[in-house]
């Protein structure tokens, strides 16, 4: 294992051993531990779910519009033609195209954060499954990224919409903002995401649903969160 930096070790020492923090308390501590960082690190949440993602009826996947955004301007590509392509461009899509865009991605280019497509384009976009799928970039009707209303999809993503999907190890990851955010705004974002994760609990999932949760900034130590928390209490 790589040796941790002095700053990492100093931050980790501020986390109380054996304690499970309330979500709002955890994000406030994550923000505190990031003080002095040369960059503005992303604040992330990681969860372990009591589901078996190998079973279709236990897959957890969803989207949520973070009330305070992500602090990041997402780069969005849109696969569309004609009026829909024009609408995507007007909405602020970073890259809009058809066969040319598909060829570019087939060539190895993936410098974007989200992809949207009109339904008629999915026959072609499907060829990109092996490239976009593993990166969680494949347009999908369930996440609102296969749609005729491409302008709304672009606006939602640019406005702070995130999507999440449990991986093969039953882990779930999502961002809730930047360390520069006010602690209350981070907590509000966490609360919105947690509410959606809980809403999506599969009926086939038995026992404890969220078995582990941590909050951390990029490259920072994980702060254990009470896995039994079902809401994030914020202070005005």
From Swiss-Prot:
Pfam families per UniProt: Ribosomal_L1
InterPro entries: Ribosom_uL1_bac-type, Ribosomal_uL1, Ribosomal_uL1-like, Ribosomal_uL1/biogenesis, Ribosomal_uL1_3-a/b-sand, Ribosomal_uL1_CS
GO cellular component, one term: large ribosomal subunit
Domain of life according to the entry: Bacteria
Keyword Ribonucleoprotein included in the entry's annotation: yes
Gene3D superfamilies: 3.30.190.20, 3.40.50.790
Molecular function per GO: rRNA binding; structural constituent of ribosome; tRNA binding
Keyword field contains Cell membrane: no
GO terms for biological process, alphabetical: regulation of translation; translation
Keyword list, A-Z: Repressor, Ribonucleoprotein, Ribosomal protein, RNA-binding, rRNA-binding, Translation regulation, tRNA-binding
Oligomer and partners: Part of the 50S ribosomal subunit.
Function: Binds directly to 23S rRNA. The L1 stalk is quite mobile in the ribosome, and is involved in E site tRNA release.
NCBIfam families: rplA_bact
Family affiliation: Belongs to the universal ribosomal protein uL1 family.
Protein name: Large ribosomal subunit protein uL1
């Amino acid at each position: 294992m790589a040796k941790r930096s002095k700053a990492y070790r100093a931050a980790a020492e501020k986390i109380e051993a054996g304690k499970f923090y309330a979500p709002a308390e955890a994000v406030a501590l994550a923000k505190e531990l990031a003080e002095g960082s040369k960059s503005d690190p992303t604040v992330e949440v990681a969860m372990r779910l009591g589901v078996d993602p190998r079973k279709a009826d236990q897959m957890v996947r969803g989207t949520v519009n973070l009330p305070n955004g992500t602090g990041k301007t997402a780069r969005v590509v849109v696969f569309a033609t004609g009026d829909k392509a024009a609408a995507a461009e007007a909405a602020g899509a970073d890259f809009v195209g058809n066969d040319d865009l598909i060829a570019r991605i087939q060539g190895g280019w993936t410098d974007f954060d989200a992809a949207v497509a009109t339904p008629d384009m999915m026959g072609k976009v499907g060829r990109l499954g092996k490239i976009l799928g593993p990166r969680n970039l494949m347009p999908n009707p369930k996440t609102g990224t296969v749609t005729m209303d491409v302008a709304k999809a672009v606006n939602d993503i640019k406005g702070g919409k995130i999507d999440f999907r449990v991986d093969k190890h039953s882990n779930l990851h999502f961002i809730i903002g930047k360390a520069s955010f006010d602690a209350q705004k981070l907590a509000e974002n966490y609360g919105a995401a947690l509410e959606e994760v809980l809403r999506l609990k599969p009926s086939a999932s038995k026992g404890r649903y969220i078995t582990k949760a941590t909050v951390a900034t990029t490259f920072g130590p994980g702060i254990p969160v009470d896995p039994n928390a079902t809401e994030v209490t914020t202070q005005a």
